[in-house]
């Protein structure tokens, strides 16, 4: 990995100087430039997207410095390494090739000297055949009935990605109902199974190793539920596996012909493009799944080929670094103005926070600057009635992404116009706010007494100067959803390179798993291991109050 001392670079120092200057300037002042929107926005007619970043606290000098920072970090060089199969996840000695899963060209991609594209295409073909058979009724359960309900059992990337996509594309769904079970809490699977018929239910068990504690625990519960009603032989007709462990899959009772492979070069949080996306294909159809891949591939090419100054994920990343490292922003809100995208913020939480929640840099040293932000959000307008108060008038500095669509999949009265009126109003209010004079004038016009005006005015001031990006698609389709997901994937990648951290490992999830395995026997009355005073007493209370 190439090295450069981050805080000692002229780009970093230039941005520090620019911050000291621009923090004194309000967006009201910056918008006196009538050409500002044209300077700081991108329109792509082929995809049908407008990316407006003009409501960010930047000027031309800021933007130039941010682009120079990206260049100095050699983002394109690392991107080419990723796309070509080099092992950029060096702590696990793995290639990072989720982009190969949606490679729509005929270009070969090599890992350890082997072209992986034939295998990827073979799995896609297998997914197509299976999903078509399931949806048409050719695949039937043990009782000869068509499958009406699919239950995906997985966790992390084997759950969040396909669940988010199925929810986002619900309008297009014309296949079986799809449910997702992830939590080891028995309530999760109980609430799903109680409304299903074993004879018409198919389970998709998604676990690369087929040993993941939560997933296998839930899968065994599902198998018992099925076999209690239909017998052991029914497993072959009602379970398929997304895994690489043939031995464990066969031991479970699943025919290895019904096992869909994926690879170590695909990280869990980037895996929805792989066989992990099987529930998507079952739900909306394989053709729609391919459209999803097409949209992501379009952004892959944009990311690789567009100049930094016109590169949407690069600009998103650079602005995030600007606020994180120079303005002290510790969180970033993602606010989709579409109920279909209500699971998108939770999906991005894993994608971003598991990727860039790191403290160790390329050289194995602890960083002395902020890295990944806290990602959170809610679909509009629900969030307006809960946490927007804090964004507008609280003490935290929170950059926001507003995601919207010109044309909704459904058309019900003027619902969409009312939704989008709020979308546009919020970014305007956050940017420009209301001054003391404007508040007093409005109160006076409303007939409020001078005494009450004096009391109310400070509470009704909106400082504004809250930065936002507006990501506005012409419509929500499988293709534009794929593009949206890929935009954020490449934003996350770019920030990881700018911060000089590995965005593709996740060692922080391991310690808790190890300790849970130590504690589990204690909750079943076995050996009492040595713990701190707090943990020891909590376990004692748990055991003494069990029924």
Curated annotation (Swiss-Prot):
EC number from the UniProt entry: 5.3.1.9
Classification via CDD domains: SIS_PGI_1, SIS_PGI_2
UniProt-listed PROSITE patterns: P_GLUCOSE_ISOMERASE_1 (PS00765), P_GLUCOSE_ISOMERASE_2 (PS00174), P_GLUCOSE_ISOMERASE_3 (PS51463)
Pfam family, one: PGI
GO process terms (BP): gluconeogenesis; glucose 6-phosphate metabolic process; glycolytic process
Active site: residue positions: 354, 385, 513
Enzyme class label: isomerase
Metabolic or biological pathway, per its Swiss-Prot or TrEMBL entry: Carbohydrate biosynthesis; gluconeogenesis; Carbohydrate degradation; glycolysis; D-glyceraldehyde 3-phosphate and glycerone phosphate from D-glucose: step 2/4
GO cellular component: cytosol
Primary localization class, coarse: cytoplasm
Gene Ontology MF annotations: carbohydrate derivative binding; glucose-6-phosphate isomerase activity; monosaccharide binding
Locations listed in the record: Cytoplasm
Reactions catalysed: alpha-D-glucose 6-phosphate = beta-D-fructose 6-phosphate
Listed InterPro entries: G6P_Isomerase, G6P_Isomerase_C, Phosphoglucose_isomerase_CS, SIS_dom_sf, SIS_PGI_1, SIS_PGI_2
PANTHER family referenced in this protein's UniProt entry, alphabetically: GLUCOSE-6-PHOSPHATE ISOMERASE
Family: Belongs to the GPI family.
Function: Catalyzes the reversible isomerization of glucose-6-phosphate to fructose-6-phosphate.
Protein name stated in the entry: Glucose-6-phosphate isomerase
Lineage: Bacteria, Pseudomonadati, Elusimicrobiota, Endomicrobiia, Endomicrobiales
Gene: pgi
